[in-house]
A protein has these predicted regions:
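A general structural signal for short secondary-structure junctions and capping/turn motifs
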Residues: 26-27, 150-154
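A short helix->loop->beta-strand "cap" motif at the edges of active sites that frequently abuts
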Residues: 144-147, 154-159
Length: 160
C-alpha cells in the first residue's frame, strides 16, 4: 500500500526544517559538494501576487527558520557552520540578537564571506537577485577549496 501525500508531508514547519537538515547532512556525508534547500511558506510568499515577505515581521520569521535549520544541520554534521546572509546589516543584527552560538555569520558583501580554515560548511541564506554573482563566486571558491583539501582533512564541507 502506497502512502498518501499527507502521510509523507512534514507535520509542522519544525518537522520540515528537521527533515531538510537531515537530508542535507545525508547528502554531505555522501560527498555531495553543493546542495539547494528550499522551504516555501505560503504566509511568506504569495506566488500569485508576487508579494514576498510583505508583512511586518515576515523577514524575522524567515531568519528564525534559517537559524533552526542551521542549528540542526550543525548538530548532525558536528562541523563549524557559517551562515551567509544577503547583507552585512542582517548578519550583524542576527549575530547581536542570537549571540555566540554553534555557527558564525557573514554576508554576501563581506570581503571574505567564509574562511576555509575555520568554516566546515557554508549556508547561504535567502540570497536576493542582486547577490547572485556573489553566491556563484562563494560556491565556486568553497568547492575549489574543498577539492584541494588534503586527504583526511575534515575541512571539506561545501556551501549548502
Amino acid at each position: 500500500m502506497e502512502p498518501n501525500d499527507d502521510d509523507v508531508l512534514p507535520d509542522s514547519l519544525d518537522d520540515c526544517l528537521a527533515r531538510a537538515a537531515l537530508a542535507s547532512a545525508s547528502g554531505l556525508s555522501r560527498g555531495m559538494l553543493r546542495l539547494i534547500v528550499e522551504v516555501f511558506v505560503p504566509e511568506l510568499f504569495d506566488p500569485l501576487s508576487g508579494a514576498m515577505m510583505a508583512n511586518e515581521g515576515d523577514q524575522m520569521k524567515y531568519w528564525n527558520m534559517t537559524r533552526a535549520y542551521c542549528q540542526r544541520l550543525q548538530s548532525l554534521t558536528e562541523g563549524t557552520v557559517r551562515v551567509v546572509y544577503p547583507d552585512a546589516g542582517v548578519a550583524a543584527m542576527l549575530s547581536s540578537q542570537w549571540g555566540e552560538g554553534n555557527f558564525t555569520f557573514g554576508s554576501l558583501n563581506d570581503r571574505k564571506p567564509f574562511d576555509a580554515e575555520e568554516d566546515d560548511l557554508v549556508v547561504i541564506a535567502c540570497p536576493d537577485p542582486q547577490g547572485v554573482d556573489e553566491v556563484i563566486k562563494i560556491s565556486r571558491d568553497a568547492e575549489e577549496q574543498a577539492a584541494t583539501a588534503a586527504p583526511g582533512d575534515d575541512k571539506t564541507m561545501p556551501p549548502v
